[in-house]
Amino acid sequence: MQLRIAVMGAGGTGGYFGGILARAGADVTFIARGNHLAAMRERGLTIRSRLAGEFTVPVQATDDPGQVPPVDLVLFCVKAYDTSAAAAVIRPLIGAETLVLPLQNGVDTVERLAAVVGSEHVVGGVAMITSTIEAPGVIAQTAGMGKILLGEVAGGTSVRTARLQEALGNAGIPAEIHSDIRVAMWEKFIFICGFSGITALTRLPIGAILASHASSTLLRGVMEEAAAVARATGIAVPDDGVERGMALAARFEPWAGGSLYHDLTMGHRLEIEALNGTVVRLGRDCSTPTPWNFAVYAALLPYAEGVPVA
């Protein structure tokens, strides 16, 4: 049986995975807005990918989820700061058996999403991908494995996650079931707080960060603090997680930067509250010091709504 899929947020992540699904013949509707929506309607969606090559597919796209009948799967890919508002408008897409798979930055978006659509509909997800909107209607994938990690939020395995894994795999998206998806979510969170936070803070790509002992020490310190907060809140992140994070950073192209870096340079809103700001808040709650993350948060907070006006 072919899944009916809606992609809420057709940016880098949603656009890439939705495009792969559409190329495989899945029934996909993209929820988008502005020039990106207009370009997709007029010319289709173009994917330029190191993994999947370059292709263009005609797509169904709308800015109104109310025009889309209930679906089997919602890929929920909006920016973290839009989570609650976007969750409210996808209600028409939710049927009795609908799964909602969030592929977002941050570690508290699952709870905010579940509070609106119902926890019974939400499974945990992690997107192992680096991709951006290169131009309206065009998604550029530049790094990452193109893989999705998924699992029940409460842990363990289930028939529905196994079926979702199979459906994604059949469409050409590698998917792996994680028995404790919260650990996987935190592992990515720890990495991007460092990688994204420090490339944004310095306005420099990762190669320049790693070439400086002082800057790479800052990168490591941010990740170590986030890992300490994870453990203090009961998340069993691996002991070698920060070392693996540093090794992963070194495997990126030297010109690469994180999502905060790209959004900052484009004058867009920043997910700073969902990233380093969350480390600071949770650290305060569990009496875990986070001075490195506070410095990143404090320096970038004036840009949270875009370029500040003097």
Model-assigned labels for residue ranges:
Residues 1-49:
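NAD(P)+-binding Rossmann beta1-loop-alpha1 motif at the extreme N-terminus of oxidoreductases
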Residues 45-61, 192:
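N-terminal glycine-rich dinucleotide-binding loop that anchors FAD/FMN and/or NAD(P) in oxidoreductases
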